[in-house]
Amino acid sequence: MTTQVPPSALLPLNPEQLARLQAATTDLTPTQLAWVSGYFWGVLNQQPAALAATPAPAAEMPGITIISASQTGNARRVAEALRDDLLTAKLNVKLVNAGDYKFKQIASEKLLIVVTSTQGEGEPPEEAVALHKFLFSKKAPKLENTAFAVFSLGDSSYEFFCQSGKDFDSKLAELGGERLLDRVDADVEYQTAASEWRARVVDALKSRAPVAAPSQSVATGAVNEIHTSPYSKDSPLVASLSVNQKITGRNSEKDVRHIEIDLGDSGLRYQPGDALGVWYQNDPALVKELVELLWLKGDEPVTVEGKTLPLNEALQWHFELTVNTANIVENYATLTRSETLLPLVGDKAKLQHYAATTPIVDMVRFSPAQLDAEALINLLRPLTPRLYSIASSQAEVENEVHVTVGVVRYDVEGRARAGGASSFLADRVEEEGEVRVFIEHNDNFRLPANPETPVIMIGPGTGIAPFRAFMQQRAADEAPGKNWLFFGNPHFTEDFLYQVEWQRYVKEGVLTRIDLAWSRDQKEKVYVQDKLREQGAELWRWINDGAHIYVCGDANRMAKDVEQALLEVIAEFGGMDTEAADEFLSELRVERRYQRDVY
């Protein structure tokens, strides 16, 4: 079925909204399209009185704006739950993604709620970077008439725990805003804290905002969504692993796997740019080692989410064993009165360093103690799924999903250790074995709506994964836009991931340019950011031609170095000073011409 798209000037949608609409409907049957058409007609007409040209007096009450700033989807889920709570309380509320928020309107907000996660070294999620920059710039307005609350999600195993939320909270207050509630900083197991916070927010807002008519709550507050899949983070699909192929050479220092998962007839859909969530199981050998070190048997009964399970099963399926945290080290030291660990208590930097260099099982080995099963369970954090950038397009692979997995392997005093999810996929799931998966949609990492738009892809290491999906999609669409890939890794002969595929794309004319950086093949190390500077003049020409820039990979070093190189290219070839170049790149981000998927 072919749909003729009218000229953009005649459309009430902006290009990004149009792209989302096209992506959401591209694989629907005529019957499904007819149903969707009726669905939206019903949404428009379900409350005609509330949508009349003359608003009811209650429409002039202060509305509540919730800004969701999410990296992995958790903040978005909390924000959606709060929106639903407020609608149930008949309050006038709207929910907006940080990337879609017109941040200059913040001065007119009366009641503002921010739900945000943190990425990298205390940075805001990608979709909130522009808003964060604006608030911390000289352009930020005074907010004396704004009351606000912030819920911050983070991971206490990282040094800059919940830093993004702390930033938003302090800056909103500095600009004159009034706190409705004190900020809440939630760890990985955030659900209970979020539930309690939502109830407090509803109570606080009930006393401030007049109750809206039900029709107005629906018309202005609801974000209508079509859920086409029954599978989610909490209800994953049980799929099967069909391919597990090592794609680095035998002499490579890296073990990178190409993993293919068969989705069967589940109907699970995804787009290039999305991530695959994988629920993994801990290595039974690791469980056995930990249990024996604590002089336990493994059959002791423990309670997990209201259910009684044997300790071994609980540890294998429900608790994080491969990532240590400062809190775990501190609590273990306090519980066991370890002479080695007690001196670290109270020193956050030392606790974090110890946690980063010493896995939980080795902490117990180095500082032995005897804990009962319940004490062990209470010490640990719940197991959470790992997210992998999807390396395929369903336009080519149909009912499969591919990911590129860098297997984490290292030694601690001669004992082999491995990452939980990566070693699960690489070592412990046999062919046709079960894998529990779900799709984490990422609307902040999408191909341009216009197939003629040039694309610049920067993805060293496993950061190349989404660009394989991009190229599969562009090839399937026969998109005429130019494509330029920057890729880097240590060695050409050992670490050129998907080499044959990239060479084929070049030969077929789908991949216009490819620049490669091999950091260990010569005396002087060369990285992708060096290639960006080297090709600065041509890069600037592409940007002037409307190219979209995509970056995927390590957030802590690579992404920052790449951004610095881009700023230098913009300044040099665009004839700008540092401040103007930064403003230019920020505008590209706002226009969704500069998108990052970093971790």
Swiss-Prot record:
Mind listing the GO biological process terms from this record? cysteine biosynthetic process; hydrogen sulfide biosynthetic process; sulfate assimilation
Q: Which InterPro entries match?
A: CysJ, CysJ-like_FAD-binding, CysJ_Proteobact, FAD-bd_FR_type, Flavdoxin-like, Flavodoxin/NO_synth, Flavoprot_Pyr_Nucl_cyt_Rdtase, Flavoprotein-like_sf
Q: Which reaction does it catalyse?
A: hydrogen sulfide + 3 NADP(+) + 3 H2O = sulfite + 3 NADPH + 4 H(+)
Any one GO CC term of this protein is: cytosol
What keyword terms does UniProt attach to this protein?
Answer: Amino-acid biosynthesis, Cysteine biosynthesis, Electron transport, FAD, Flavoprotein, FMN, NADP, Oxidoreductase, Transport
Q: What is its EC number?
A: 1.8.1.2
Q: Which domain of life is it from?
A: Bacteria
Kindly give the NCBIfam families that the UniProt entry links to this protein: cysJ, PRK06214.1, PRK10953.1
Its recorded name reads Sulfite reductase [NADPH] flavoprotein alpha-component
Q: Name the species this protein comes from.
A: Escherichia coli O9:H4 (strain HS)
